[in-house]
Each structure stands twice: as structure tokens, then as C-alpha cells.
Curated annotation (Swiss-Prot):
Gene (UniProt): murA
Gene Ontology BP, a term: UDP-N-acetylgalactosamine biosynthetic process
Name of the molecule in the record: UDP-N-acetylglucosamine 1-carboxyvinyltransferase
List of residues binding UDP-N-acetyl-alpha-D-glucosamine: 91, 120-124, 304, 326
Keyword list, A-Z: Cell cycle, Cell division, Cell shape, Cell wall biogenesis/degradation, Cytoplasm, Peptidoglycan synthesis, Pyruvate, Transferase
Catalytic activity: phosphoenolpyruvate + UDP-N-acetyl-alpha-D-glucosamine = UDP-N-acetyl-3-O-(1-carboxyvinyl)-alpha-D-glucosamine + phosphate
Listed CDD domains: UdpNAET
Signal peptide coordinates: none
EC number annotated for this UniProt entry: 2.5.1.7
Its job: Cell wall formation. Adds enolpyruvyl to UDP-N-acetylglucosamine.
Gene Ontology cellular-component annotations: cytoplasm
Length: 417
């Protein structure tokens, strides 16, 4: 098993390019089931979850290729079953449910590993499809759905679920009649999926707002499409620049989609300026201030940037709080940061952070994707050596991270444990 070794205390300086968004690429890849004819997607990040999704597409009857950062896919003989050995490693694979029901009238998709219905919003997906005419059985860990022909419906989500919105968006594109999604997720990745479907011939309006309207069409056609840049990767580099008191020019930065993060970083004393070629990030006056943050669905502050901002607050001149309102158990990184010298107290879903003068390198263990990113950022600024274990989490969401960081001055490399 690999670990990441970081010799901290070095400022990061220079240009750093943001890869394509994994969270946009995954639903768009699964939407490749829908159109007739070939599809070419560019700016696709080379990540483990992407490779898993391509395996799933192959099993479902697509012909796929992955050359550089371009994926080409075409449906040849569509099957209806997504097996457990693939789905267990990646929750996003439940997004093939909508396209399969819409095209084949039947889908058999394994429940993601450890995911009981009700514990995560898989039930929101199923309730929506039931409104569109599908019926479901839960059989030996599989969701087995059937329908004659999905029909448009008025769907009002209890919570603006990203996956639920994406699943219904795909199915409704070729369902019979009009579908209206109220309390729809507004995330940029949902908007990117809608733009892809529109490029394939779908009739969608309202994407990016809380009410999306879809007029079903008989069929979709293939197209060429470029995946949006990864806003969370870009946000992570913003924090890394401020954390190490360096200056980064972040290229291919989706600046408008990071408005809530940029607002908080500026309040903390970080300068972020758009210019030709990217966004230049550095400390405004040398000091970092604490702020109060509450995670919310988009356009609120993203839960996926919570751990990184907490890490920056650890070196602030003052104190701040973070209230996590999206996920439970999203503070797994706190004890690891404390091992590096951070002053953090937890009370329920709120973390109270008081800044310290310096952090010290230590062996730490990543518990999830964003926690691992926060530990890498902490290691970049810490005095001495930090070993980040379990970086397979990191490999799920960051393309060539150590190569990109090394190119802007970081002393970071991969070792086998």
C-alpha cells in the first residue's frame, strides 16, 4: 500500500493546472448509455473511479476507449445488470438506474456496499422513479426496477440530492412527456450533465436553479463534449498557496463556481485575482484570520472544502468554527490534525479551531478523499516530515497530485509502506 511523504515548510510558487471534474465526469459517463452513436468526452481525469465506471460501461454493453484524457464510448448491446463487484467500490454507479429504466424498461443494480436504503438518499431516487411509473423490488442486495415506459412527472425532492437530480435528469430526457424537478440540486456538476444531455439533443431548461424542466424526446444522439474543471481540486490549491505562504497561478480554474469558497478565503486574508491565464492566489498581508463556516448545498459552502479550510484555520491568527450540515462523520481528519499540533475541539457537528503558530510533521492516516487532501495541505506547511497513509482515498479524486505539487516546489513523493 502506498503512502505520501511530505517534507514541509516550503512555499509553493508557479502555475498549477486543474484537471477535469470527477464528480461531473462520472454521471456524464453513465449518461453515455442513452445516446445512439459515438460519444467523445475530453478533459476526463485519469482516476480510479473513472476506470471503474468504464468497466461498468463495458459490462453494460458499451465499447469504450480511454486515450490520454479522452474517453470514447458507443452502446453496442445494452444489458440491464450492474454487478455488485463493481458497484461496491463506487456509490455513483447507482446512476445507471435511470438510463437503463428509460431505455430498457428494466434495471438490476446492486446496492452500493454498506448502503442500506434510507441511510443515504438512494430512496429519493426510487421514489422519484416510482412517480414516473417504475416499480422496485429489493432482492439479494439488488435493486430490481421495471416499467413499461417511464412517463414524465412532477417530482419534489425532500432534499436537493445531487445523485437523485442527476438520475432523474437522465431518465426524463427520453421519458414520455414533461418532467419537473422541484428542489433540484444546483451544483455545477449537475449543470454540466444537463449541458451534455442538451448537446445530445435533450430539451432541458432551468438547470442551475432549484426547478428543472425536461421535455422528453424520442432519442438522443452522440456528441463531443468537454468535462468542466474540478472546482474542489482548484479550491484545494487555493488553500495550499495560502497555507504555505506561496503564490500559485491556478490554470483552468472554475472561479465562478467557487464563489462561496472565494468569499471565505478573502475574509481569511487570502488574495484571489482573476487574470489572463488563471487565478493568482497568495496571502494578502501575511496573516490568516479565523472565520465561521457552515456547509450547505450549492450555492452554499461545499462540504468537500470543509476539511481544507479547517486546515488553513489551524494556522490562523485567531479562532473560527465549522458546522457540518451535509454529512455525518465528516470530522475524521480532526484527530490527525491534532496529532500535527492543531488546536481543535469538537462538539456534535461543530468544530472550534484556534490557530497555532506552527504545525509539526507526523504520521497521519487518511479516512476519506477530502480528509486526505487536508492532511497533504497540512503536511506542506508543517515543519518536518509527514507520512500520509491510505492515500488510495486521494487517488480517487486527485489526478497526479504529487507531480503537480512537486512542479510548484513541494517536496513530496510516494513510497510503499
Amino acid at each position: 500500500m502506498d503512502k505520501l511523504v511530505i517534507e514541509g515548510g516550503v512555499s509553493l510558487n508557479g502555475p498549477i493546472r486543474v484537471s477535469g471534474s470527477k464528480n461531473a465526469a462520472l454521471p456524464i459517463l453513465l449518461a453515455c448509455i442513452l445516446p445512439e452513436g459515438p460519444i467523445c468526452l475530453s478533459n476526463v481525469p485519469r482516476l480510479r473511479d473513472i476506470h471503474t465506471t468504464l468497466k461498468l460501461l463495458d459490462i453494460l454493453g458499451c465499447e469504450t476507449s480511454f486515450d490520454g484524457n479522452t474517453v470514447c464510448s458507443e452502446v453496442k448491446d445494452l444489458k440491464i445488470e450492474a454487478p455488485y463487484d463493481l458497484v461496491k467500490t463506487m456509490r455513483a454507479s447507482v446512476l445507471c438506474l435511470g438510463p437503463l429504466l428509460a431505455l430498457k424498461g428494466e434495471a438490476k443494480v446492486a446496492l452500493p456496499g454498506g448502503c442500506a436504503i434510507g441511510a443515504r438518499p438512494v430512496d429519493l431516487h426510487l421514489t422519484a422513479f416510482e412517480q414516473m411509473g417504475a416499480t422496485f423490488d429489493l432482492d439479494s442486495g439488488y435493486i430490481h426496477g421495471k416499467c413499461d415506459k417511464l412517463k414524465g412527472a412532477h417530482i419534489n425532492f425532500d432534499f436537493p440530492t445531487v445523485g437523485g437530480t442527476e438520475n432523474v435528469l437522465m431518465a426524463a430526457a427520453i421519458a414520455e412527456g414533461e418532467t419537473i424537478i422541484e428542489n433540484a440540486a444546483r451544483e455545477p456538476e449537475v449543470v454540466d450533465l444537463a449541458k451534455f444531455l442538451i448537446a445530445c439533443g435533450a430539451k432541458i431548461s432551468g438547470h442551475g436553479t432549484s426547478i428543472i424542466t425536461i421535455q422528453g424526446v424520442p432519442s438522443l444522439k452522440g456528441c463531443d463534449y468537454k468535462i468542466m474543471p474540478d472546482r474542489i481540486e482548484a479550491g484545494t490549491y487555493m488553500v495550499a498557496a495560502a497555507m504555505t505562504d506561496g503564490e500559485l497561478l491556478i490554470q483552468d480554474c472554475p472561479f465562478q463556481e467557487l464563489e462561496s469558497v472565494v468569499y471565505k478565503l478573502r475574509k481569511m486574508g487570502v488574495s484571489l485575482e482573476e487574470e489572463e491565464g488563471g487565478v493568482r492566489v497568495r496571502r494578502a498581508n501575511g496573516l490568516i484570520s479565523g472565520v465561521d463556516i457552515t456547509t450547505q448545498p450549492y450555492p452554499g459552502f461545499p462540504t468537500d472544502m470543509q476539511a481544507q479550510l479547517m486546515t488553513l484555520m489551524c494556522l490562523s491568527n485567531g479562532a473560527g468554527t465549522i458546522e457540518e450540515k451535509i454529512f455525518e462523520n465528516r470530522f475524521m481528519h480532526v484527530q490527525e490534525l491534532v496529532r500535527m499540533g492543531a488546536n481543535i475541539k469538537l462538539k456534535g457537528r461543530t468544530a472550534m479551531i484556534r490557530g497555532v503558530e506552527k504545525m509539526t510533521g507526523a504520521p497521519v492516516m487518511a479516512s476519506d478523499l477530502r480528509a486526505s487532501a487536508s492532511l497533504v495541505v497540512a503536511g506542506l506547511a508543517a515543519h518536518g516530515r509527514t507520512d500520509v497513509q491510505r492515500i488510495y482515498h486521494l487517488d480517487r479524486g486527485y489526478e497526479k497530485l504529487e507531480d503537480k505539487l512537486s512542479a510548484v516546489g513541494a517536496r513530496v513523493w510516494r513510497e510503499q509502506e
